[in-house]
């Protein structure tokens, strides 16, 4: 088995159901040929294409990292060429030979990286909330000081 990654771009005008069908069919090609999907990520939104393709300036990106056979890659690319929903695709071979232990390690590494990213995002959000609270507190203090100054009577001195 070898490790590959494929990114493919789907038409932005497709329904969510059709997008999911294309993704499921693509993943099924890999799994049916005794492959393993290490990581896949649909973009979830249309993004601008750097180059216009088939008169479309946007697309729905899907990234897939997997271990499979060359036959599975050939079949997947054959279907991409036939499928009108796929605007572009590209497959890159990452490793010629990968063992089951290396696959599990890659899956674990990706899970750890995702957990670290999630933790960092939560920490950043907490820090942002803390900053907002401090700013609100300072604004409230200044408003209170201004109110006290306005409420205090001004003594006029006679000369």
UniProtKB/Swiss-Prot annotation:
It comes from the Bacteria. Disulfide bonds: none annotated. GO terms for molecular function: small ribosomal subunit rRNA binding; structural constituent of ribosome. InterPro entries: Ribosomal_bS6, Ribosomal_bS6_sf, Ribosomal_S6_plastid/chlpt, Transl_elong_EF1B/ribsomal_bS6. One of its GO terms (cellular component) is ribosome. Keywords: Ribonucleoprotein, Ribosomal protein, RNA-binding, rRNA-binding, Selenocysteine. The keyword Transcription regulation does not apply. Coiled coil: none annotated. GO terms for biological process: translation. Belongs to the bacterial ribosomal protein bS6 family. Binds together with bS18 to 16S ribosomal RNA. This is Small ribosomal subunit protein bS6. The gene is rpsF.
């Amino acid at each position: 088995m070898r490790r590959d990654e494929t990114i493919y771009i789907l038409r932005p005008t497709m329904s969510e159901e059709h997008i999911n069908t294309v993704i499921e069919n693509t993943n099924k090609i890999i799994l049916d040929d005794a492959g393993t999907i290490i990581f896949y990520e649909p973009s979830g939104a249309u993004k601008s294409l750097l180059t216009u393709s088939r008169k479309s300036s946007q697309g729905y990106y899907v990234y897939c990292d997997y271990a499979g056979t060359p036959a599975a890659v050939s079949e997947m690319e054959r279907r991409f060429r036939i499928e009108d929903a796929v605007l572009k695709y590209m497959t890159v071979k990452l490793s010629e030979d990968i063992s089951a232990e290396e696959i599990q390690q890659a899956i674990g590494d990706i899970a750890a990286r995702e957990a670290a990213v999630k933790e960092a995002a939560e920490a950043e959000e907490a820090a942002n909330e803390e900053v907002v609270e401090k700013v609100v507190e300072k604004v409230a203090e200044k408003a209170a000081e201004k109110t006290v100054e306005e409420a205090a009577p001004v003594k006029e001195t006679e000369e």
